[in-house]
UniProtKB/Swiss-Prot annotation:
Its EC number is 2.7.8.13. GO terms for biological process: cell division; cell wall organization; peptidoglycan biosynthetic process; regulation of cell shape. It comes from the Bacteria. It comes from Haemophilus influenzae (strain PittGG). Catalyzes the initial step of the lipid cycle reactions in the biosynthesis of the cell wall peptidoglycan: transfers peptidoglycan precursor phospho-MurNAc-pentapeptide from UDP-MurNAc-pentapeptide onto the lipid carrier undecaprenyl phosphate, yielding undecaprenyl-pyrophosphoryl-MurNAc-pentapeptide, known as lipid I. It is found in: Cell inner membrane. GO terms for cellular component: plasma membrane. This is Phospho-N-acetylmuramoyl-pentapeptide-transferase. Pathway: Cell wall biogenesis; peptidoglycan biosynthesis. CDD domains: GT_MraY. Its cofactor is Mg(2+). It catalyses: UDP-N-acetyl-alpha-D-muramoyl-L-alanyl-gamma-D-glutamyl-meso-2,6-diaminopimeloyl-D-alanyl-D-alanine + di-trans,octa-cis-undecaprenyl phosphate = di-trans,octa-cis-undecaprenyl diphospho-N-acetyl-alpha-D-muramoyl-L-alanyl-D-glutamyl-meso-2,6-diaminopimeloyl-D-alanyl-D-alanine + UMP.
């Protein structure tokens, strides 16, 4: 939005031309989202306490989690607000990719909001019925995907980039829709499953979003895209602003969510952030890199799938409890140790993912 204002004001003061640079707006988006989160955080927490929007805890979970019962939840609304305001302020709103990102972010946020609200009003951990939850997640994902397919079905925007192989970039055609669906819905659920300990999901989210900001910038720069042997995507450079807004909002939320947490993001935050990461990966054609850099999310989701599958087939559990972070808790690891070690792993995976861009 401010890009348009700057274009007008530059006639009177050339300094406003700085706002036209994507790097400047990306940094400002990060700082804006960060400061908004820090500013509204205490107000949101207080309001959630007044409304008695407290966390419900599984009866079969680790005993240490019983103390978390009643901690304000649905703090994800402050994340969404911070990202939304920052993106609308600093992004070029003529870019269709920005609207696709915001659509998925707030679409999944709305689904998570309803899910959280039902848990709170029912005083248990049962939210939306699973089939309805997946139905609405699918609707949001498919609308976004068809929108993107219409924008770029005959360009590099629908090619599949494979790490380490610079000359293998097949045109996906209609399979683009299928792959994109699983990326968005899968990432939304994976981040949601990871959000079980204080700060566990939000830091990897910030790290992955920061990495995608760099990738989006390179993908939207024809010279760097050619140098790295990745597709040049016309609209992708503006996604940098959206990604840095996620980083800023995530760090601001972490201020209140770090152990011991003052607030939880709830499904309204985790589903929205997961969906946002998924759609960004699709926009910059780096679905495989999402699997690498978001490895913590992948392992958390796989641990649940394996646990459920093993119990149904063999009546035996692989882990003491799933998702896998609870397994380590039940082994005796203190919660902060689990969190920090998962953060370290996430940082290593993000760096590995970035390195693959050059190893081609």
């Amino acid at each position: 939005m401010l890009v348009w204002l700057a274009e007008y004001l530059v006639r009177y003061e050339t300094a406003f031309n700085a706002i036209s640079y994507i790097t400047v707006r990306a940094i400002l988006a990060l700082l804006t989202a960060l400061f908004i989160s820090l500013w509204i955080g205490p107000k949101v927490i207080k309001r959630l306490q007044i409304l008695k929007f407290g966390q419900e805890v599984r009866n079969d979970g680790p005993e240490s989690h019983f103390a978390k019962k009643g901690t304000p939840t649905m703090g994800g609304v402050m994340i969404l607000f911070s990202i939304g305001v920052s993106t609308l302020l600093w992004a070029n709103l003529a870019n269709p990719y920005i609207w696709v990102c915001l659509f998925v972010l707030f679409g999944y946020g709305a689904i998570g909001f309803v899910d959280d609200f039902r848990k709170i009003t029912r005083k248990n951990t049962d939210g939306l019925i699973a089939r309805w939850k997946y139905f609405w997640m699918s609707v949001v994902a498919l609308v976004a995907i068809l929108w993107l397919y219409w924008l770029g079905h005959d360009t590099d925007a629908t090619r599949l980039v494979i790490p380490f192989f610079k000359d293998i970039m097949p045109q996906l055609g209609l399979f683009y829709i299928v792959l994109s669906y699983f990326v968005i819905v899968g990432t939304g659920n994976a981040v949601n499953l990871t959000d079980g300990l204080d700060g566990l999901a939000i830091m990897p989210t910030a790290l992955v979003a920061g990495a995608f900001a760099l990738i989006a910038w390179a993908t939207g720069n024809v010279n760097f895209a050619e140098y790295l042997h990745i597709p040049y995507i016309k609209y992708s450079s503006e996604v940098v602003v959206f990604c840095t807004a996620i980083v800023g909002a995530s760090l601001g939320f972490l201020w209140f969510n770090t152990y011991p947490a003052q607030v939880f993001m709830g499904d309204v935050g985790s589903l929205a952030l997961g969906g946002a990461l998924g759609v960004v990966a699709i926009l910059v054609r780096q679905e495989f890199l999402l699997v690498i850099m978001g490895g913590v999310f992948v392992v958390e989701a796989l641990s649940v799938i394996l646990q459920v599958g093993s119990y149904k087939l063999r009546k035996q559990r692989i882990f003491r409890m799933a998702p896998i972070h609870h397994h380590f808790e039940l082994k005796g690891w203190p919660e902060p140790r689990v969190i920090i070690r998962f953060w370290i792993i996430s940082l290593m995976l993000v760096l590995m993912g970035l390195v693959t861009l050059k190893l081609r």
